[in-house]
């Protein structure tokens, strides 16, 4: 895995989030879901260095539990392959929920499988990122997905 630093992409996102905070809004709250503690720490670190508020959980089941008690999540970034519930299954549950369906969901995977990517996008994923996720990926997501 490559070393991730707060490069130019992270600075752009940080500036954009700081502008939101100066305007009186709270930083966007991102729910990061990954069963790998290493990958979870990497994505959470990138998001936090860009001044996002991050909650990181290790499963789709825990993500749904958290969303049930705190639906004010700005975006969900989830791994595709996880035990018990895949990121694809989490995506479907979020999009089927009248309370949660407007939350943008981004799927991540270490595998670049075109049919999987297409299926996730057709089910309503905002984007599909191939790991390792970089600060520039987060910058692009912020400018495109979050208002």
From Swiss-Prot:
CDD domains: REC_typeA_ARR. Induction: By cytokinin in shoots. The modification 4-aspartylphosphate is found at residue 79. GO terms for biological process: cytokinin-activated signaling pathway; phosphorelay signal transduction system. Residues 29-146 form the Response regulatory domain. Keywords: Cytokinin signaling pathway, Phosphoprotein, Transcription, Transcription regulation, Two-component regulatory system. Two-component system major event consists of a His-to-Asp phosphorelay between a sensor histidine kinase (HK) and a response regulator (RR). In plants, the His-to-Asp phosphorelay involves an additional intermediate named Histidine-containing phosphotransfer protein (HPt). This multistep phosphorelay consists of a His-Asp-His-Asp sequential transfer of a phosphate group between first a His and an Asp of the HK protein, followed by the transfer to a conserved His of the HPt protein and finally the transfer to an Asp in the receiver domain of the RR protein. Belongs to the ARR family. Type-A subfamily. Coiled coil: none annotated. PANTHER family: TWO-COMPONENT RESPONSE REGULATOR, TWO-COMPONENT RESPONSE REGULATOR ORR11. Disruption phenotype: Dwarf, narrow leaf and low tillering phenotypes. Functions as a response regulator involved in His-to-Asp phosphorelay signal transduction system. Phosphorylation of the Asp residue in the receiver domain activates the ability of the protein to promote the transcription of target genes. Type-A response regulators seem to act as negative regulators of the cytokinin signaling. This is Two-component response regulator ORR11.
